[in-house]
Amino acid sequence: MHFLQNAVVAATMGAALAAAAPLEKRSCTFTSASAAKSGKSSCSTITLDNIAVPAGETLDLTGLKKGTTVIFEGETTFGYKEWKGPLISMSGTDITVKQASGAKINCDGARWWDGKGSNGGKTKPKFFQAHKLDQSSITGLKVYNTPVQGFSILADHLTITDVTIDNSAGTSKGHNTDAFDIGQSTYITIDGATVYNQDDCLAINSGEHITFTNGYCDGGHGLSIGSIGGRSDNTVNDVTISNSKVLNSQNGVRIKTIYGKTGTVENVKFEDITLSDISKYGIVVEQDYENGSPTGTPTNGVKVEDITFKKVTGSVKSSGTDIYILCGSGSCSNWTWSGVDVTGGKKSSKCKNVPSGASCSD
């Protein structure tokens, strides 16, 4: 009798374990956004096969199981609607995101582009919300024509490698098509990004231990820290931006802070940056932004300290300015300036409170 009872218990437990096992190692292929949303929690490998996301909906990959791999296959597309988005949202821990050979994510942003970006006109959806995508990686995605901003990053230990964002079709009407916006994040690495856009290639609004390297930025507003000030988190610390090219852009490298606000920008390195055909500023540090525009009057509430400009070289158009530094009184300090050679534009006569070692006339 005891043997029979034990056998029944063992059989029951075995059946339960067998039923549970597929949930731990299940590979799933989804062909619709709704199927992905409803089925994602039971999958350890998710293949998104030629998904057409309906208008006004998000490809919802939030709350993924730890260790999930997500593969974009074929062409991912999105229906048209005026809304804020995002088109894709993803969260989880130890997530691997990649694409199959020949795959692409086609946002078809031209349907929204009206030259106004996020400042009016049509309401445009942001592209990819990587919030709480921790200890994870995104590799090799090819993204075309985002309506406005690209990757919104609020994460810890996220590595993005060899991602292409091609908004070159938006040269005339695309606007605010930032590639990577980072806030309240730690240990973010972006390596080998290729970007054609109409706004910042990189914008760091807050965060620590951030690396951007081997980037290629064409057509936008350059590599930016800020704007800093007026947010819940106004600290940027330990940032390295290196071995990158900025071409045909409004700015090369930039730090901008908000007029009358407080915060800290420290331990930031711009190293081995090559500039070409920059239209406005090769190197620019401004502490006078108010309502999104410079005022010409800097304030010193945001400290800009321990900043390195090393081997930042290249050309500015004759209508532009090589270097512009507008610091508040005593707020910019302990800068390292070496191998800087930016030429072709004007020399600014409006620089203020330039820290020792730096120069507006190099």
UniProtKB/Swiss-Prot annotation:
Pfam families: Glyco_hydro_28
Glycosylation sites: 334
Subcellular location: Secreted
Principal location: secreted
Alphabetic keyword roster: Cell wall biogenesis/degradation, Disulfide bond, Glycoprotein, Glycosidase, Hydrolase, Repeat, Secreted, Signal, Zymogen
Active site as annotated: 199, 221
GO cellular component: extracellular region
Repeat region (PbH1), residues: 155-184, 185-206, 207-227, 236-257, 265-287, 299-344
UniProt-listed Enzyme Commission number(s): 3.2.1.15
Molecular function GO labels: polygalacturonase activity
Signal peptide region: 1-20
Organism for this UniProt entry: Aspergillus niger
InterPro entries: Glyco_hydro_28, Glycosyl_hydrlase_28, PbH1, Pectin_lyas_fold, Pectin_lyase_fold/virulence
Family: Belongs to the glycosyl hydrolase 28 family.
Cited PANTHER family: ENDOPOLYGALACTURONASE B, POLYGALACTURONASE
Descriptive protein name: Endopolygalacturonase B
Disulfide links within the chain: 28-43, 201-217, 327-332, 351-360
Entry-linked Gene3D superfamilies: Single-stranded right-handed beta-helix, Pectin lyase-like
Catalysis: reaction(s): (1,4-alpha-D-galacturonosyl)n+m + H2O = (1,4-alpha-D-galacturonosyl)n + (1,4-alpha-D-galacturonosyl)m
Enzyme class: hydrolase
GO BP terms, alphabetized: cell wall organization; pectin catabolic process
pH effects: Optimum pH is 5.0.
Prosequence residues removed at maturation: 21-25
Function: Involved in maceration and soft-rotting of plant tissue. Hydrolyzes the 1,4-alpha glycosidic bonds of de-esterified pectate in the smooth region of the plant cell wall.
